[in-house]
Each structure stands twice: as C-alpha cells, then as structure tokens.
C-alpha cells in the first residue's frame, strides 16, 4: 500500500491495494474500553415455542453490541447468580450483590408462520425497578436486526444517547482472481455481519458516501479508465452516472436534504469544489483558485462546505459559505490536515492529521478550537462518524501494511479493530440511522 494521504492519492488517481482472500464478515475486536465501564448482565433469552429455537442468539447479539461500545462491561454467563426470563423472577438484591447495575432479560415468542416477538425488559438493580420493556416483531430473517434495535433502546435508556447498532457500514474490498484484482463495494451491518456486495469492478472504487435517507450510495469508479461518480441504490435496483467530465471527478458529498451533491472537478483546470443540483444536473462553482481544492463536507444546516486545500502551501481544512465570501481556515496543527468529516451535530470535525511522516485521526471542536489526536497509527485515513456521533470509523494500515478498518470514540477512550479473516478493506462510510 502506498504511504500517502488520501487527498494526494485520489488526486493522482492512484489506488494501490494488496491482493485479498475470500470475502467474509468483519470481525470486531475491542482493543480499548472505558475505565469503569457500566456493569450489566444480559441474561440468555428464553424460547417459548415448540421444537428447536431459531438459530439467532438474541441475548448474545445484544451483549456483543453493548460490549463493543466500550461503555459496558457485560457479566459472563457462568457468573450470573440467576437466569430469569420474566420480570417477577428478577432478584434485585442478588444482582446488586454480584456488582451488576443493570439486568436485561427477555424471551423469543412465536407469533405465527415464521413470525416472532422479541420481548425484553431492562431493570435498574440499584433502584429496584424496571426501566423499560419492549416487544419487537420480526421474521426469522429479521431477528438479528431486532436484536440491534433492542440494543439501541437499551443503550439510549442508560446513556441518554441514541444507539447506532442498527446501522450499516459501506467499504471497499479487493480480491485477486486469475491474477487480476477485483474491486467490490460492500455493505455490512455495523457489527460486521451480513456483508453484501453492491457493485463489482475490475477497476478501483473510491469514496463511498451514504445518501441522507440511507437508501443510496455515491462513489467514484474507474471502470471506464477515468474517474466517474455514480449513485446506486443499495439494493442494486438502479445505478446512475452523474459526473463524467474531462479530468478529475471525485469526492462526492450529499447535501443534508439529499437534493444536491458537492464534488471535486477539474473540468476548468485546477481541481475545485462544485455543487450539483441532482434534479437538473446544473453546477455551481464554489471555489476558484490556483490551488487544489477537494474533499468537500457539508455542515448540517446545508449553508457551508468544509474542504481541503493546499492554498497555504500545505493541505489544510477551510470553511466556505455557499452565499459567497472568502473561505476561512480552520486547521493549524501539523503540516497536513485533510479529509474533513463533521459530527452529526456539526460541532466536531474529524480529519486526517499528518506530521512527522505519520497520518493519524484527529478532531477539532469548532466552538472551542480544541484540537485532539485520537489515534496513533502510521497511516490512518478516511474517518466517518457514526450517526449518533459517538464513534468514528476509519481505515488504517495493519500488520505488514495490510489495510484494516478501525474505530475510535470521539473522545479517544474506546478503540476497536474491524478485521477480515483474510484480506484488506478500505474506504469506510458509516450509514445514517436507518429507521
């Protein structure tokens, strides 16, 4: 893999990746959690139907989700003092004595042909009361999603922050077949399960980005030996080329309302930022300079764009109002700052910070101007916020330079590694909320 930041790579239209093995689900490993994480017990869910229970282990999925967040320390099943499936059987004193603050119990109840109700309750053992309880209808193919929905509810009830377990991640993988590389744009659940291929190509795929409604992806494809921007439904039903101008077509970014797209074009000379009206394909030129301007990112109100520019000599991040005026420089820490992505509330800017030959993920608070490095890798790039703003997924160079995905919390306290059993993955993009 070529050790250069994403901005330079994309502008040179290079995309060098090592050959991969077979595609598989991403395995998520917790490498650092919050000190003093919340003690919680997810009691194995009961099965109230005849015969064998469905294969999905609802309780295990919820436990894995909460553990993966880094905010919770789930009790091992072998240490649980009791295994109730009904609220009246929960002994608060016993659980408090075991050092558990919250208990989740539940059951899977048949509700007709291939229909089930995932019923669960969350209890606060300190206060000795039920916090919440839900019944989620699902078919057998939807049980894993129901477990993610339950995880979101539990997470929000305890932390006050909406959970992001029932979301998806898009990424690019590469395989080698018959001595040639094969590129694939894939979408998986946020926990790495259920990977699906959206598009395959013999040529590189770059910069996938989700539409605000979570139904489409925009990305850059080189299938016609030139960079072009496409929009595709995630179910594969429709695919449309929206930018194929002479020169560079790169870095698509949906507006918050989904009606416009910011992109980088070199049709008029140097790479500049443009905004396309997706209804009539009309273009508004946002920047016009002799520098390289790229990697646009919308503010949540749709009024401003952040972008990367080398107009000061080295790549730095700027903010430009769409109503006009001069761009304002935002970053001053390090020789390189690029690939800006905003938290959903618009307060934090995640970016790639380069200094001393290393590229790491950092965040800048737009209100306080506080700058913080979050990662310590050699080549970390392509940050993307979870829709609740709690985590940032990014690409990194793993052992031997192999490309992996990783995630870090916005405060740097929680770290995860997302690894294919064989191969390499790049270009992550976290979906918006899907419900």
From Swiss-Prot:
GO annotation, cellular component aspect: periplasmic space
Question: Where is it predominantly found?
Answer: periplasm
* Keywords from the UniProt entry: Cell cycle, Cell division, Periplasm, Signal
Q: Which SUPFAM superfamilies match?
A: TolB, N-terminal domain, Tricorn protease N-terminal domain
Signal peptide positions are 1-24
Q: Which GO terms describe its biological process?
A: cell division; protein import
Location in the cell reads: Periplasm
Under the heading Gene3D superfamilies, the entry gives: TolB, C-terminal domain (2.120.10.30), TolB, N-terminal domain (3.40.50.10070)
Q: Which Pfam families match?
A: PD40 (PF07676), TolB_N (PF04052)
Functional note: Part of the Tol-Pal system, which plays a role in outer membrane invagination during cell division and is important for maintaining outer membrane integrity.
The protein's assembly and partners: The Tol-Pal system is composed of five core proteins: the inner membrane proteins TolA, TolQ and TolR, the periplasmic protein TolB and the outer membrane protein Pal. They form a network linking the inner and outer membranes and the peptidoglycan layer.
Question: Which family does the similarity line name?
Answer: Belongs to the TolB family.
According to UniProt, the name of this protein is Tol-Pal system protein TolB
Name the source organism.
Thioalkalivibrio sulfidiphilus (strain HL-EbGR7)
């Amino acid at each position: 893999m070529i050790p250069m930041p994403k901005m330079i790579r994309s502008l040179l239209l290079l995309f060098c990746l090592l050959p991969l093995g077979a595609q598989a689900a991403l395995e998520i490993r917790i490498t650092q959690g919050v000190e003093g994480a919340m003690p919680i017990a997810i009691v194995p869910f009961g099965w109230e139907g005849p015969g064998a229970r469905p294969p999905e282990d609802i309780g295990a999925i919820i436990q894995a989700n909460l553990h993966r967040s880094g905010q919770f320390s789930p009790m091992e099943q072998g240490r649980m003092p009791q295994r109730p499936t009904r609220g009246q059987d929960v002994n608060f004193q016993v659980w408090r004595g075991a050092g558990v603050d919250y208990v989740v119990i539940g059951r899977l109840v048949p509700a007709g042909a291939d229909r089930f109700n995932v019923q669960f309750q969350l209890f606060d053992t300190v206060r000795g009361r039920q916090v919440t309880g839900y019944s989620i209808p699902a078919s057998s193919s939807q049980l894993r999603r129901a477990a993610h929905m339950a995880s979101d509810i539990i997470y929000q009830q305890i932390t006050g922050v909406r959970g992001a377990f029932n979301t998806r991640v898009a990424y690019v993988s590469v395989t080698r077949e018959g001595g040639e590389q094969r590129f694939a744009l894939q979408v998986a659940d946020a926990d790495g399960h259920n990977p699906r291929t959206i598009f395959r190509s013999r040529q590189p795929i770059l910069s996938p980005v989700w539409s605000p409604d979570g139904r489409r992806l925009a990305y850059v494809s080189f299938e016609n030996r030139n960079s072009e921007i496409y929009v595709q439904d995630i179910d594969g039903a429709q695919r449309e080329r929206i930018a194929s101008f002479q020169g560079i077509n790169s870095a698509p970014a949906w507006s918050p309302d989904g009606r416009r797209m910011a992109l980088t074009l070199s049709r008029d000379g140097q790479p500049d930022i443009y905004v396309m009206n997706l209804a009539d394909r009309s273009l508004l030129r946002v920047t016009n300079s002799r520098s390289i301007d790229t990697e646009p990112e919308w503010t949540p109100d749709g009024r401003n764009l952040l972008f990367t520019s080398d107009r000061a000599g080295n790549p730095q991040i700027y903010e430009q109002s769409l109503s006009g005026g001069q761009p304002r420089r935002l970053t001053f820490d390090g020789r390189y700052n690029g690939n800006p992505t905003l938290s959903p509330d618009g307060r934090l800017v995640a970016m790639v910070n380069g200094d001393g030959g290393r590229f790491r993920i950092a965040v800048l608070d737009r209100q306080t101007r506080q700058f913080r490095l979050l990662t310590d890798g050699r080549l970390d790039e392509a940050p993307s916020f979870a829709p609740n703003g709690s985590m940032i997924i990014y690409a990194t160079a793993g052992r031997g330079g192999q490309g992996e995905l990783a995630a870090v919390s916005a405060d740097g306290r929680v770290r995860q590694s997302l690894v294919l059993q064989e191969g390499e993955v790049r270009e992550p993009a976290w979906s918006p909320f899907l419900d």
